[in-house]
Amino acid sequence: MIVQNLFDSSGNWIAFRAGSHVYSPDGDWIGWLPWNDDDVVDTHGRYLGTIFYGNRLYHVLGKPYRGYPGYPVYPGYPGYPGYPGYAGYSPLPPGTRDVAFSTSTR
């Protein structure tokens, strides 16, 4: 399975995607992509963020509610993907902020 590493605007590794599921750097399941696009919801079905530029995870402010996405089957532990390093700074697109993980998401 191909792993897509996700970073914040400062270039810090904050998550990775394996298939349609998103995990913390520790391998904890934190979300998934229910609509086959770049929008990520947390494990409770709340909007978490959107993948930009192929490797950045940003929260879009004022994102319209898309409805409850349902609940997928628990994906299990993906294993440790290895540390990808630092991605470098990337300015935030207008109307976005870095994803703020809560204790219920991580």
Specify the residue positions occupied by each region the protein language model found:
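Long terminal segments
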Residues: 1-4, 8-12, 44-106
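Short "repeat-start/strand-capping" segments in structured domains, especially the N-termini
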Residues: 2, 17-21, 35-39, 55-56
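Short, low-complexity intrinsically disordered segments
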Residues: 11, 30-33
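Fold-core signature of tandem repeat domains
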Residues: 30, 40-41
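N-terminal, post-signal-peptide region of Sec/Tat-exported proteins
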Residues: 32-35, 45
